[in-house]
Structure formats: structure tokens, C-alpha cells
Amino acid sequence: ISLLNRLESEGFSDEVYGLFKKSLETLAQLHIKGDEGLDYNNCLTNKEFGKQAIMADLLYFKYYFLDALRKPYDKQKLIDDFEALSNYLTHTEYKYFMFRDFQSRNIMVRNNEPFFIDYQGGMKGAPQYDVASMLWQARANLPDEWKNSLLEDYMNAFENIIGQAI
């Protein structure tokens, strides 16, 4: 059963929160430890999540979400924001293994332990991308309190592994 299935059946319970937290703590380990010695030449798509891939994902969001809403927005400001975000993500000093599709539907739960599936999009990239994918996934619709707490949980786990503040 997936973490998303658990969320849908149990709601925003303490147990489900614990599974999200454990998933993000395990993700921090995999980001860092999974990067060590990994030959990114063997990646299925790209070796690294660069600016073009980031812009493609952001434009996908624009076309299939924002434009589908048919609500007015400042298109130039949005593109400027996309440009700034893609620059930030490509110039971060923290680049590790990145899933690229890290969402609760790709986390299986067995005996209250999370197991990750769907690695084919993995490459070197900014770990923030996976964390954002998890916290802001549309189908989960996590409450803001959960997002803030889970982000803090992830950052604490990441800092503990690398031994310094981020």
C-alpha cells in the first residue's frame, strides 16, 4: 500500500504524519549516501538536473495547471520567477542524488516502514526539488502546518548527516 493510500484512508493522523516524517528522513540519507560513488553516466535520462530540465518542469506546470485554470496572471513575471528559481536550483552547492518524482504515491509502506519505488528519473540535482515534490504534491494536499514541520524535520535530518547547518 502506498503512503498516499494511507493518507487517503486514514487522513491527517499522527501515524500518517510519522510516515511522512520517516520518509523524508530516509530521503535525506538517500540523497547524501546514495550520491556517494554513484556513476551518473548510467542515468536513464540526464546525468544532472540542469536548467533546461527545470524549466521544462516549470513550463509543464504552467501549461497544465495555471493555463488550465483560465485565470489571469502576469505571464512575464511568472517566467521571470521560473528563471530565478531555475538559476537558484542549478547553482546550489548541495547537489546529490535526486529522485525527481518523490511523491507519496511512490512510497510503499510495509510494517510502518517506507520503501521507495520509481527511480528511473533519478539523477544528480538539488535535494530541495524532491522535498518540494513531496510537500506540495497536489493529491496529498498537505496542511501548511504539516509542510512547515516536515520541512524542518527534513532539514534537521540532512544537517545531522552532513554535520553542519544548511
Where are these regions (language model features)?
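Active-site acidic catalytic loop and adjacent metal/ATP-binding pocket
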Residues: 27-31, 84-131, 138-142
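Short charge-dense sequence patches
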Residues: 7-13, 28-39, 97-108, 156-166
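Flexible, glycine- and charge-enriched loops at secondary-structure boundaries
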Residues: 13-20, 75, 140, 144
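Alpha-helical elements of Rossmann-like donor-binding domains used by nucleotide-donor carbohydrate transfer enzymes
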Residues: 22, 26-29, 60, 84, ...
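An alpha-helical support segment within catalytic cores of ATP-dependent transferases
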Residues: 35-47, 52-53, 57-97, 159-165
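ATP-binding pocket architecture of kinase catalytic cores
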Residues: 1-56, 67
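Active-site activation/catalytic loop segments of kinase-like enzymes and analogous catalytic loops
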Residues: 59-68, 127-164
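Alpha-helix N-cap/helix-start motif at coil-to-helix transitions, marked by capping-box chemistry
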Residues: 21, 52-59, 122-125, 145-148
